[in-house]
Regions:
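Well-ordered alpha/beta subsegment
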Residues: 93-128
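Residues immediately within or flanking Cys/His clusters that coordinate Zn2+
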Residues: 24-27, 41
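Short, cysteine/histidine-rich loop/knuckle motifs that typically chelate Zn2+
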Residues: 29-32, 43-49
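Conserved hydrophobic positions within beta-strands
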Residues: 61-64, 100
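Short coil-to-beta-strand transition motifs
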Residues: 53-62, 106
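A broadly conserved sequence feature marking short terminus-proximal activation segments
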Residues: 1-25, 118-128
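Short, conserved beta-turn/loop elements at beta-strand boundaries and strand-helix junctions
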Residues: 66-72, 119
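Short functional micro-motifs and their immediate structural scaffolds
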Residues: 38, 51-53
Length: 128
């Protein structure tokens, strides 16, 4: 059996992955214009500032879009098929992507809450 690939944090993403290991969501916020962003990056896409701070996020949001994966893009994920991927509008503003709890029925606007699996990858569950 092939092991699932794990994230390899960069300098910019390390605080995100450390929080994920603890089951928490942390997002970058520009210290100049206060725009919240995800995924972590070294420069604010709004004002181009390099000043960044990290905030604890609620992990709550609503499904913006979804799709069902029927093809594994890595052999280690083949046993997981099919699975639902969602793009979520987070309460703090940015969008995040992850899997939807397999027991949940996907729909646009579904209120969800984020958790992290043992592999530190995001899993959204209905918050209704």
């Amino acid at each position: 059996m092939t092991e699932k690939p794990v994230p390899h944090p960069t300098e910019e993403s390390l605080p995100y992955w450390e929080a994920a290991s603890a089951g928490k969501l942390r997002l970058q916020r520009c210290a100049s214009c206060h725009a919240v962003r995800h995924y972590p990056q070294p420069v604010c896409p709004k004002c181009y500032s390099i000043e960044v701070e990290w905030i604890d996020a609620s992990g709550r949001g609503a499904v913006h879009s979804w799709t069902v994966a029927h093809h594994a893009f890595h052999p280690a994920f083949k046993a997981d098929l099919p699975y639902t991927l969602v793009i979520v509008d987070l309460e703090e503003g940015p969008r995040a992507m992850g899997r939807l709890d397999p027991a949940a029925a996907p729909r646009i606007g579904l209120p969800v809450r984020l958790s992290f699996g043992a592999d530190r990858l995001p899993i959204f569950t209905p918050a209704e």
